[in-house]
């Protein structure tokens, strides 16, 4: 048992002292067994939410209707959830009701995949009623019980399956894959925002190429926003070996390959801020196809986005990325954005004694370009002289 679990032991031990069962469950146990970095630690217990809140001094009822209470111990938050079973699902996405139970097995039985239905007690002993450990050894993603039932309960589980393929490099069991092929259309009942969360994780996984290939093989792509006609583009995307390093690069590379623009991205319900970043990368990639296309003007315009653009360019055009070299060139520019100019609009209004207007923005752009191309030093007095000279249209400015 590693240090993160040892820190959380006090929560388990406290619950047990009060006569309740308690176990580590979920992704943390799975990742511990895979010797991967562990995220948040979740605990399942026979104690009901009110009992949990009565036992611990610092709690937050984050999802009390579904049995979840946040317990804060030594400054660390743990989600403690009552053993439960779920009633009939509505709209292919959520149970109509949940019933608290006292059985760990019943709780594990409601989970999506066998690898996520493993529990661990305070001694580090594994409780695995559905063969999750063997699935981990075989590197297989399989549902708990009948995949048709699991996917009809919550259709988003099909996207989660492919997301785990991308993150872990596992394969789908034959039954799970066949069920995705058969029930993929149920994704149409799921909110785009929920799909986008899973799809983004898929795009960022180290085995994204494998997951994209499965997206095509299972025909699940046909039920994702704006992708029904993009089979060939997705096949092309699955051939790239470079793994995106962050969400901007992941979405921009995806959007570039499948020819998405603003409207298609908006239909994925992405934030305006993220869409802006993606569109900047797409604009650059329309012009920058080789290293020689990184002109001084391109470096200046896209500087902060160089790592994203260059890695996408290299992946798409089968080249080696030159991020470090380009960033050094960008850093050596006389200015890296307009705010670094030693003169501003107010200075120019005083200098020329004129009211603002189109002339002012044109003058600032001219000064900006002149400094960038080292036609004049970025010093206020020299810029004033250059501006006066430029205003008179003299050739020796």
UniProtKB/Swiss-Prot annotation:
Any other noteworthy remark? A single active site specifically recognizes both ATP and CTP and is responsible for their addition.
HAMAP family membership: CCA_bact_type3
Q: Does the keyword tRNA processing apply?
A: yes
Enzyme Commission numbers on file = 2.7.7.72
Name the family the entry cites.
Belongs to the tRNA nucleotidyltransferase/poly(A) polymerase family. Bacterial CCA-adding enzyme type 3 subfamily.
**Listed PANTHER family:** CCA TRNA NUCLEOTIDYLTRANSFERASE 1, MITOCHONDRIAL
According to its UniProt entry, one GO biological process term is: RNA repair
Gene3D superfamilies, alphabetically? 1.10.110.30, 1.10.246.80, 1.20.58.560, Beta Polymerase, domain 2 (3.30.460.10)
InterPro entries documented for this protein: Bact_CCA-adding_enz_type3_sf, CCA-adding_enz_C, CCA-adding_enz_firmicutes, NT_sf, PolA_pol_head_dom, PolyA_RNA-bd
Q: Which NCBIfam families match?
A: PRK13299.1
Ranges in a coiled coil: none
Q: Which CDD domains match?
A: NT_ClassII-CCAase (cd05398)
Quaternary organization? Homodimer.
Residues bound to ATP are 27, 30, 111, 154, 157, 160, 163
Q: Where does CTP bind?
A: 27, 30, 111, 154, 157, 160, 163
Q: Which residues cross the membrane?
A: none
Q: Which residues bind Mg(2+)?
A: 40, 42
Q: Which named protein is this?
A: CCA-adding enzyme
One GO MF term on file is:
CCA tRNA nucleotidyltransferase activity
Q: Which reaction does it catalyse?
A: a tRNA precursor + 2 CTP + ATP = a tRNA with a 3' CCA end + 3 diphosphate; a tRNA with a 3' CCA end + 2 CTP + ATP = a tRNA with a 3' CCACCA end + 3 diphosphate
General function of this protein = Catalyzes the addition and repair of the essential 3'-terminal CCA sequence in tRNAs without using a nucleic acid template. Adds these three nucleotides in the order of C, C, and A to the tRNA nucleotide-73, using CTP and ATP as substrates and producing inorganic pyrophosphate. tRNA 3'-terminal CCA addition is required both for tRNA processing and repair. Also involved in tRNA surveillance by mediating tandem CCA addition to generate a CCACCA at the 3' terminus of unstable tRNAs. While stable tRNAs receive only 3'-terminal CCA, unstable tRNAs are marked with CCACCA and rapidly degraded.
Q: Which cofactor does it need?
A: Mg(2+)
Q: What is the lineage of its organism?
A: Bacteria, Bacillati, Bacillota, Bacilli, Bacillales
Q: What keyword terms does UniProt attach to this protein?
A: ATP-binding, Magnesium, Metal-binding, Nucleotide-binding, Nucleotidyltransferase, RNA repair, RNA-binding, Transferase, tRNA processing
């Amino acid at each position: 048992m590693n240090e993160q679990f040892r820190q959380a032991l006090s929560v388990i031990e406290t619950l047990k002292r009060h006569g309740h069962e308690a176990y580590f469950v979920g992704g943390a146990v799975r990742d511990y067994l895979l010797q991967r970095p562990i995220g948040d630690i979740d605990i399942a217990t026979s104690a009901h939410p009110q009992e949990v809140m009565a036992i611990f001094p610092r709690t937050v009822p984050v999802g009390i209707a579904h049995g979840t209470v946040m317990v804060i111990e030594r400054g660390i938050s743990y989600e403690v959830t009552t053993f439960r079973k779920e009633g009939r699902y509505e709209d292919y996405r959520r149970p109509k009701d949940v019933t608290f139970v006292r059985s760990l097995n019943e709780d594990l039985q409601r989970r999506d995949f066998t690898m996520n239905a493993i529990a661990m007690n305070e001694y580090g002993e594994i409780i695995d009623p559905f063969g999750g450990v063997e699935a981990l050894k075989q590197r297989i993603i399989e549902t708990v019980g009948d995949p048709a039932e699991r996917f009809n309960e919550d259709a988003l589980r099909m996207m989660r399956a492919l997301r785990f393929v991308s993150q872990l490099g596992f394969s789908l069991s034959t039954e799970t894959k066949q069920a995705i092929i058969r029930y993929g259309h149920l994704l149409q009942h799921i909110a785009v925002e929920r799909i986008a969360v899973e799809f983004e994780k898929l795009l960022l996984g180290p085995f994204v190429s494998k997951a994209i290939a499965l997206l095509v093989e299972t025909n699940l792509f046909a039920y994702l926003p704006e992708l029904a006609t993009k089979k060939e583009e997705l096949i092309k995307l699955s051939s790239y070996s470079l793994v995106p390093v962050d969400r901007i690069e992941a979405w921009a590379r995806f959007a570039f390959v499948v020819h998405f623009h603003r409207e298609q991205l908006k239909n994925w319900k992405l934030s305006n801020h993220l869409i802006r970043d993606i569109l900047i990368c797409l604009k650059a990639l329309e012009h920058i196809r080789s290293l020689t296309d990184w002109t001084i003007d391109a470096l200046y315009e896209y500087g902060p986005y160089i790592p994203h653009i260059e890695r996408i360019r290299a992946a798409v055009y089968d080249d080696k990325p030159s991020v470090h070299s380009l960033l050094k060139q960008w850093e050596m520019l006389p200015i890296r954005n307009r705010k670094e100019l030693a003169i501003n609009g107010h200075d120019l209004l005083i200098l020329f004694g004129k009211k603002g207007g189109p002339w002012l923005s044109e003058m600032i752009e001219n000064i900006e370009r002149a400094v960038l191309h080292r036609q004049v030093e970025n010093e206020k007095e020299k810029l004033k002289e250059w501006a006066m000279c430029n205003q008179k249209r003299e050739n020796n400015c």
